[in-house]
């Protein structure tokens, strides 16, 4: 059986600094039978000139649609049997397309495939290194049989993508969890999703504290929690393992203990908790957190040293804290929604008197 023809779709918005590296990597790919479609989401720079210089098919959205809308537009014009989505700030390896083609050629029951970032992030600063390395570790240690999808570098059979309607840009107009939600639909439709750990790509993004918090909380944690509650589907993989859930709860208890510490030192609450008991409880929680996450912290020590890992632990526990808070608040919102909808009742008729049907 011959390898499938591939269509590589690259959504981009003002990507003049990163798009050339992305397209150059595709141009020197070891795989031969593929096309590249650059979907320009109303950029104001020279994106078109860059795309045409590298021989890519150029498409432009009628208005700003976000990456999900750009991918959908590219898919509508693609000629390949397999659609490969590559972010404009991603550099594929020479063998990346070969791996995708091989997966779909040899495993006819596979509907979608995705990979991970590599362990050599482009930017040397701590936050960019940590964020991309944590992504690499989570994907590389997760099950190969996934129930979600990742569009940073992921592929879907064209017929499956079109049958399911592509990315839901009505629900997720901004870059969010539109890829995860599509993965849910693929899985619920009976499709198989493969996490191919050979597919590793370089991420060119430089992370900032503000950008990380916005992405982690507003663009990921909140919509993903709502999706989990709506579908009642909590996949115990990637960032949602039992140990991750338990760690989030423990970090919440740790924060509570640290908040109580000044009051206990001042003599408050002595009737029901003493300083030695609180100190011991905090120490036990810290020990449990270190034990639960020992593998990833040992992995960081081996690759970046003790000092880097100490910072990684603090950022990791911060992630557990705000993710746990988001889940708790969204769960409360989910519980209260039926009561709120019942209180609102039927919609009012605002037509003038005598005009109602």
Question: Locations of the language-model features?
Answer:
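Catalytic donor/gating beta->alpha subdomain of glycosyltransferases that bind UDP-sugars
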Residues: 168, 173-237
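Membrane-embedded multi-pass helical conduit in multi-pass membrane proteins
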Residues: 249-328, 332
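Short, flexible, basic/aromatic active-site loop/helix in glycosyltransferases
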Residues: 112-117, 128-148
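A conserved acidic beta->alpha catalytic loop
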Residues: 25, 32, 40-48, 63, ...
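Conserved donor NDP-sugar-binding/catalytic core segment of glycosyltransferases
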Residues: 91, 95-127, 204
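N-proximal low-complexity "stem/linker" segments adjacent to membrane-targeting elements
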Residues: 1-28
